[in-house]
């Protein structure tokens, strides 16, 4: 019982300690005692299992907790559970809450780490894809009941604030040409153009990200500034796209460098772009 609920019941006279105004000196009439069976405790939710699929909206996918119903992986779905781990909620001998920074940092580092091995391909393939991971943990109430799991979901970003339907199992998908073609990072126009939108290559597009360039950090690991980030990939991207072009003397290329917000989120590299015929 929560403190709020207990206070409400006391106010309504439904808990001991309330006075009903009757004469306490009179002998109360005997009343038959009723034997009641206490209700059975609620069954805890089952622990998630890897290999299950879910139909999530974009908003649900980025929420901290979500009570998702499992759907058949043969049906339409936007998320697949690829890893289930156990939360460590004890720090220096003391329990910490499931929504504490310490616990959430554990999950936010575990899921991206597990994703790379699950999807296959190279680190570059993952950078050049629209596949990502979101993670869920029990609510505070579920944690209090003893649930200590966290689950990692693989999703594909289809476009701005939109998830792409997953095309079959995703295990090892970036190790295949078909997987890289479906889930690759593409654009509706040249990066920097007014009508540019980043989309999965399964969607209509005219440009494709074909390489990445690491950007050297500034002092103390800080964002180096837009000028330095821009300069970092110009020649590399030009060479990358030249090697892919039908005519190495006549081709178009693009370079998209990280801004300060993207840098703070962990993207310390830029993208090389090439038009698609």
Whereabouts are the PLM-identified features?
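Short, conserved catalytic or interaction motifs in soluble domains
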Residues: 20
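Long, compositionally biased stretches enriched for glycine and/or charged residues
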Residues: 23, 27, 32-277
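C-terminal motif of bacterial Sec signal peptides marking the signal peptidase cleavage site
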Residues: 14-17
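Intrinsically disordered, low-complexity regions
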Residues: 11-12, 84
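N-terminal export and membrane-targeting signals
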Residues: 1-10
